[in-house]
């Protein structure tokens, strides 16, 4: 089902813990969003864990909306993924490299349903660009001194 996933990776000159702490903090998500759709965290914990639910104020094509997400995968400093009503998942995987930083892979996984809709709406290509932007922003934030 890899054809229903979009993934991009980047190497960040920071330990996995620092990077993971950013990703696991919904309040930081607007700083890390390459799509320009994430506005602010409105509900949920300050730091995510398996099963956490968190709400985000969003805006797409000028229209505001609220999205509730639930963490469905969690391995401290290694993997975190969440899904929402659309059933697709956003997943981050972190791999510390020997003295070379941390490889971060972000995946938009739409194998869980509505694949035809996602493909027809252009979501895979649009989300690939957004992931690339998000990873650049994550790198910038994580590498700050």
Q: Where are each of the predicted segments found?
A:
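Helix-adjacent hinge/juxtasegments
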Residues: 57-74, 80
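Short, highly charged C-terminal tails/helix-capping segments
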Residues: 36-39, 140-145
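Beta-strand/loop substructures that line and gate deep hydrophobic ligand-binding cavities in soluble
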Residues: 79-133, 138
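A short, structured loop/turn motif at beta-sheet edges
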Residues: 16-17, 47, 73-77, 93-103, ...
